[in-house]
């Protein structure tokens, strides 16, 4: 689903210190700060460019190797938050076609202690969460990692836990081409002039996602995190294209772009690979390659899903697609076709793709009869059954009729054999006002919340 861009601000302040604080940079090429970590923390080398203070008993000074950066790979930086409150940037080489992809042994550790619970997994045609194998319900709140008020994030998870919603999908990307004002949340900067990309791990960067993961652990909610958007909201493919050239359809095969994308995947996966709060990683949100052969997305998905599994074999991986290009039950309408470069059944057969996803927006797709959606759900359930993998009804919504037609789709999802559903999207009042709102939003505590969420949960619990 396309999302409305929103910006959250945070003033980053701090006092200088002779020691590097928790999770701060403490070494690496060109680094001139302190290599001594605070008491109870030690300096661990993650690569030649970056060492970080991690939990441990002693402080050590990392060694620096002299391995040169491949000349054919774009520069990718990690912006680390230090105790002075000032971001320090250090360049690291991203993987390129001529450079072996990094293995999981070289990935950085999770930045937060992991909570209780177990890794979610596929169990036949269903999902197993913390020892329970059954049908699950959840929602989308793409905007949550961009909130700067911790209390707002805590409130969202309080409400999800109370409602029994076990799965939450949030954006794991926020790409920009111009450095925003200090304190503006972004995750990665693609600089066209410098030909570099910078990953922001500061207080207005991935530390916001850190808090979301920690809150999910606390409340027993599992997160789905995609790495890039096909739409321009929050950067998308175009943010890469503006910096490195090509087009949105060439994004999947552009070597420089893919090396930057893989470097970002490694940075995020390495932070949370030990967290039980991660339900699954997704290659992207609604990947499309308009007019392309289906081999393009299939080949890309095969390569990237295997790469993610090499970094983190414990969590599930999904494509994050809309479910287009389905032959089973096809009525030859636009969603069943392959014009957007997807072949649902072929992609589902990729060994490192653990489950299928489907989205449903009749109005946006030019479908006049909302009842059409019931067949869409049923036919995907059949395809997943044939593949022996679960199906996640990952996004669905309509402009109005939340309490009529959407409830019918939910009942179809329950009865057809899909494994879970996530309504688009969750909304609530925040300290700054309403959360990002579109025509599909279901706000907590409203009449629509009761019918579209609470009534649905009653049916889920009976299932």
Swiss-Prot record:
Chain positions covered by the region annotation Ser-rich linker: 75-118
SUPFAM superfamilies: (Trans)glycosidases, Cellulose-binding domain
Localization terms from the record: Secreted
A GO term, aspect molecular function: mannan endo-1,4-beta-mannosidase activity
Annotated Gene Ontology cellular component terms: extracellular region
Residues carrying covalently attached carbohydrate according to the record: 87
Primary residence: secreted
Pfam family, one: Cellulase
Record function comment: Endo-1,4-mannanase, a crucial enzyme for depolymerization of seed galactomannans and wood galactoglucomannans.
Domains as described in the record: Has a modular structure: a carbohydrate-binding module (CBM) at the N-terminus, a linker rich in serines, and a C-terminal endo-1,4-mannanase catalytic module. The genes for catalytic modules and CBMs seem to have evolved separately and have been linked by gene fusion.
Family listed: Belongs to the glycosyl hydrolase 5 (cellulase A) family.
Annotated protein name in UniProt: Probable mannan endo-1,4-beta-mannosidase F
Organism: Aspergillus oryzae (strain ATCC 42149 / RIB 40) (Yellow koji mold)
